[in-house]
């Protein structure tokens, strides 16, 4: 399993995600995260990767440059390593 740490305005939340599992499926049980479409087509759930990698190829909202800057659509992100993500970043776009 991969260790996921979400840095939220209310503090850090850490949990494990199995390979191939969307982090939101676990995170939504542990934190009050902003969600809307849950399909990677909007920016409500936007976060920024501090460390680690995710697969967010299902998403359509972010362009390559935004992804290179570390932005991540947490609703569709599948961790590919241990990962640390800052949540609640929609206002930055």
UniProtKB/Swiss-Prot annotation:
Protein origin, superkingdom: Eukaryota
Gene3D superfamilies on file: 3.10.20.30
Name the UniProt record assigns to this protein: Ferredoxin-2
Family, as annotated: Belongs to the 2Fe2S plant-type ferredoxin family.
GO terms of molecular function: 2 iron, 2 sulfur cluster binding; electron transfer activity; metal ion binding
Its job: Ferredoxins are iron-sulfur proteins that transfer electrons in a wide variety of metabolic reactions.
Pfam families with a match to the protein in the record: Fer2
GO cellular component: chloroplast
Subcellular location: Plastid, Chloroplast
Lineage: Eukaryota, Viridiplantae, Streptophyta, Embryophyta, Tracheophyta
Alphabetical list of InterPro entries matching this protein: 2Fe-2S_ferredoxin-like_sf, 2Fe-2S_ferredoxin-type, 2Fe2S_fd_BS, Beta-grasp_dom_sf, Fd_pln
Primary localization class, coarse: plastid
Keywords recorded for this protein, A-Z: 2Fe-2S, Chloroplast, Electron transport, Iron, Iron-sulfur, Metal-binding, Plastid, Transport
Disulfide topology: none
